[in-house]
């Protein structure tokens, strides 16, 4: 039993570290993309906060998902996993941030096939549409338990195949963003091993 508990603790620690790396990358991409979409720096910074914490609900599910991957989950358990955006919203709403609807809606799809509310098109807050693009790209270029990270061009091709899920205007601006030298450097920094970073390194990577 002790060994099982230690394995679970190690899994949750690694899951937490992975979440930090993902959150930092998504936050930086969201901040830059938001300004390209015409938002002010203050509005973009609020979205950056949303992006940093958007998956906090997954921490509540870590023990349940121990040893599994999204690919391996049966359909009923994938539906359980899809609750994480609502859990994130519920955990954060007491802080009265302006970006709670963005956290709640970051898995909504432009064609109405997303969750938790099946919003369509511009019913989805602009911030959530921006965060969705950044979040999906960051996931594709990161290692997962069931696959290696895709390179940037392959990730973009996969996203084009799924364009019905996204606001195409946001996605076209994102395509411009990811070919800028500063964005490529940001992506490369995000791939550093978090064990080699201290908190000042993480803050440096995530600064404006």
Model-derived segments and their meaning:
Residues 2-208:
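Histidine- and acidic-residue-rich, metal-dependent catalytic cores
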């Amino acid at each position: 039993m002790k060994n099982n508990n230690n394995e679970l603790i190690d899994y949750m620690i690694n899951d937490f570290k992975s979440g930090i790396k993902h959150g930092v990358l998504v936050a930086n991409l969201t901040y830059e993309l938001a300004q390209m979409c015409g938002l002010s720096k203050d509005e973009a910074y609020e979205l950056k906060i949303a992006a940093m914490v958007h998956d906090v609900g997954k921490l509540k599910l870590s023990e349940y998902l121990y040893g599994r991957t999204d690919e391996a989950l049966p359909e009923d358990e994938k539906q359980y996993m899809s609750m994480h955006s609502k859990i994130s919203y519920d955990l954060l709403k007491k802080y009265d941030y302006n970006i709670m609807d963005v956290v709640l809606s970051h898995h909504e799809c432009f064609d109405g096939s997303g969750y938790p509310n099946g919003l369509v098109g511009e019913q989805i807050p602009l911030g959530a549409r921006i965060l969705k693009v950044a979040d999906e790209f960051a996931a594709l270029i990161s290692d997962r338990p069931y696959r290696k990270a895709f390179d940037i061009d392959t990730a973009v091709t996969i996203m084009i195949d799924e364009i019905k899920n996204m606001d195409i205007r946001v996605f076209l601006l994102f395509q411009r963003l990811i070919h800028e030298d500063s964005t490529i450097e940001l992506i490369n920094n995000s791939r550093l091993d978090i064990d080699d970073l201290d908190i000042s390194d993480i803050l440096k990577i995530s600064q404006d």
